């Protein structure tokens, strides 16, 4: 847990490489029509397994909005993964404050409502993120999720019984994104010498 104000993680190299590749294939991508300067927020806290399963949804959102500025709101343990996957322009760490940490709530409220987001993809679907939706009052952005009153709801009443991959893909279809790929982990890289593994291992 990270207490206090939101902490920003800059994404540079990985994002630029993905953006170059996307521009080469943008004519074949299904794109949701939004202004080129559109600001988009993606929310995904979750556990490690669920975060990995959401990578395909992250990729689909980026391909649907190749020219938008996309920010991920996540928790501290997943900031490095979010940075290295290359689908986001910026990563913000949500401290997930308790009720008594009112200054952190004010910082979070200010970030969510004052950053100029025109569309939000809530991939977390929690009571906490529903509170973020209510932060906006009457002037809400386009919102994909299950918060009551959102503009692009995932309406399937059986969504909780669906596999995470199917549920996220269906949510994005309801928001206008036709295809969601399976998670691609080819970009994952790191040193493993400390584990003293044999040359061949599974």
Write out the residue ranges for each language-model feature.
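Catalytic machinery of carbohydrate-active enzymes
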Residues: 2-202
């Amino acid at each position: 847990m990270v207490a206090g104000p939101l902490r920003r993680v800059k994404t540079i190299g990985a994002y630029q490489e993905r953006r170059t590749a996307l521009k080469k294939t943008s004519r074949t991508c299904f794109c949701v029509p939004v202004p080129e300067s559109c600001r988009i927020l993606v929310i995904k806290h979750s556990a490690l397994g669920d975060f990995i399963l959401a990578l395909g949804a992250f990729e689909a959102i980026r391909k649907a909005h190749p020219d938008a500025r996309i920010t991920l709101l996540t928790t501290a343990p997943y900031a490095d993964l979010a940075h290295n996957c290359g689908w986001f322009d910026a990563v913000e760490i949500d401290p997930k404050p308790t009720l008594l940490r009112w200054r952190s709530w004010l910082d979070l409220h200010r970030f969510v409502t004052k950053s100029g987001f025109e569309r939000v993809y809530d991939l977390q679907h929690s009571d906490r993120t529903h509170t973020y939706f209510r932060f906006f009052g009457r002037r809400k952005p386009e919102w994909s999720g299950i918060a009551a009153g959102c503009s692009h709801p995932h309406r399937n009443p059986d969504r909780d019984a669906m596999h995470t991959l199917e549920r996220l893909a269906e949510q994005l279809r309801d928001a206008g994104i036709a295809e969601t790929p399976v998670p691609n982990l080819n970009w994952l890289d790191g040193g493993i010498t400390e584990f003293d593994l044999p040359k061949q291992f599974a």
